Amino acid sequence: DELGLEFDDVGITGYPEGHPFISDATLAEHMQKKAPHATYLATQLCYDADTILEWIARIRDERDVDLPVQIGVPGVMNYAKLLSISREVGVGDSLKFLQKTQGIVDFIKQFIGSRGKYTPDDLVEGLAPHYDDERYNIGGLHMYTFNQVPDTESWRTDMLAKHR
C-alpha cells in the first residue's frame, strides 16, 4: 500500500532443461520454498514440447508444485540470432535441437524454405493437445521476442487465425 501498487500475481521461474550453473537439487529446493508464495510459474525458453511436458509432470509428481505454468516460447527470429541467444542463456544444446527438428536434410530444407527464420509452430502445436489438461495446468505462453516483436506478432496473428 505504501507504494500505491498492488501485486496481484507473482511468478517464479522454472527450467525444463535445467540451469547451466545451478544444480537440479538446488532448483528443486528453491522452487518448493517459493511456490507457496507464487501465483504462477514461468519457464525459461525451451524448444521441445516433450521436454516441457515431461518437466511439468515431474514438478507435479516430485515437487508437488501445482502452479499454472506460463511456457517460455522463443519468438520468430533468424536462426543465427536464435543460436546465439540460446548459447548465451544456456538453453540445451541449441545446434542439436535445430538439427534434430527433422533431421539434417529436412533441417536444411526448412532453413531455406523459412528464409532462415525460426517459427515456434512445432512447439506450440506439440503443446496444444495439453492446454486444457488439468494435470499440466498450462496458464499460457510467454513469448520471448528478443526485440523481434513485429515478426512474432505477425506469426501469432496468423497462428490464431489458422486455428479458429
Predicted regions and their residues:
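Short, surface-exposed basic-aromatic patches at helix termini and helix-loop junctions that form
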Residues: Q32-P36, I56-D64, T157-H163
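Active-site glycine-rich loop that binds ribose-phosphate moieties when present
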Residues: F21-P36
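Active-site-adjacent beta->alpha loops and helix N-cap segments on the catalytic face
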Residues: D1-E2, F21-A25, L45-D61, Q148-D158
